[in-house]
């Protein structure tokens, strides 16, 4: 309907321009929805935009525009308000047309082709495979998967990717932690487990599986084991242990390293699949090393004159590209930094021909954005094609009690535990109830409630109520409406028009949610649509004896159910027909 009114407004402006009464037509015509229906269904400020160029009062220009509007079966009347706003009041027929459209387009209602021809790469979650996913990772997973669905619904070609940090120091710390638990099982660990090792029970499980696989084959590395408690610096202590294990185990260090990586990565994959989060590719950081991509990226920066050596380390001159300080690419021991791998990874993303790249990182990585963009500019790439969405933390509550967590200590609620307690639907929905850059309080007790307080239950219940009406119709021997040909002109009540008006908004919300990268707009819309439906359901007798009226009202209800199902699908939430 907005497109129809915009077209009519465009026609009026073209007529005035042809008559020489306005010098030109604005490039974009904004049509807003007034907050109060008394001010119309749509409003335009075009007369105010033209006032300066025309040299006349906006209200007088608005009078000319209204007079030039073509006759329409959908526009009931117009009203000039305030300094020169044009308010449009629509006929019921316009809203009936929306109901027909929903019933015709079905699961495609709300989709558009705004992103046609654009190929986007999205990277999200990408948690280090050093332990199970926890509830904090769940927010990034739900946000990323929902945004991918929304962008696809807007016609974008989306490629989702998980970057596996399998080549860094944290993986070595995990390997060392597994080895210490491997020794501990035989009481062969001479001192307490170090504080900066990975301490979760899952490490013991990995160590037990490793023992089943290799037996005592790795025990020999316990000889000459450095005495970690005697070292005052925990980082130096753990690095000394890692160096000892690499030297003592030789090729078997790869077996130890893989024991943790393979088991945890398999668990992460399974967890995300179970959460409805799917990737086109799992991209290994180690593959960047193996293929020489990191060497090539660093060499390109050196060749362009953007690097220098200081105290044996190779530095990238990031300050020349608006970062707050220069960054190390290669340490004095010859090892590349995580930043060097990240530069290579992003250069490789652009080499694959994506028109746009979206990274979703934890909010604690905000300082990382300038350095990555600086490296892209230094490589001659357009850093504006990289968009970084920072996802704030999710804080877990059980009622009013906050649940504290420590990842390294192994004291955390896993994503799998959350899903098992509240269900996938509640988890997916609650995670996207706020903008990504806002802190999220996740109340476990609320997520399990079967009441109006729980938004996902409230929305799903609206969908189920529609199908309950259909079952009741069959039980009462009442005919159901045909797929098409239902006369909707009989729907004239204000609540029916309001409900159809809410349906009309869905395609707009889909478009703005994609533009703003905000899945929560879909969640908010669905809650409003469900509220409008529940109000209608509770105040209106839908299964009346009169067949034409019953068919029309059921058709309206089915259109509501379809819109709810479409919106929930974008958020990865089911739309049950019975609850």
From Swiss-Prot:
InterPro entries: aa-tRNA-synth_I_CS, Arg-tRNA-ligase, Arg-tRNA-synth_N, Arg-tRNA-synth_N_sf, ArgRS_core, DALR_anticod-bd, Rossmann-like_a/b/a_fold, tRNAsynth_Ia_anticodon-bd. GO terms for cellular component: cytoplasm. GO terms for biological process: arginyl-tRNA aminoacylation. Pfam families: Arg_tRNA_synt_N, DALR_1, tRNA-synt_1d. Monomer. Its EC number is 6.1.1.19. It is found in: Cytoplasm. The keyword Translocase does not apply. It is an enzyme of class 6 (ligase). It comes from the Bacteria. This is Arginine--tRNA ligase. GO terms for molecular function: arginine-tRNA ligase activity; ATP binding. Coiled coil: none annotated. It catalyses: tRNA(Arg) + L-arginine + ATP = L-arginyl-tRNA(Arg) + AMP + diphosphate. The gene is argS. Belongs to the class-I aminoacyl-tRNA synthetase family. Signal peptide: none annotated. It comes from Acidithiobacillus ferrooxidans (strain ATCC 23270 / DSM 14882 / CIP 104768 / NCIMB 8455) (Ferrobacillus ferrooxidans (strain ATCC 23270)). Keywords: Aminoacyl-tRNA synthetase, ATP-binding, Cytoplasm, Ligase, Nucleotide-binding, Protein biosynthesis. A motif ('HIGH' region) lies at residues 127-137.
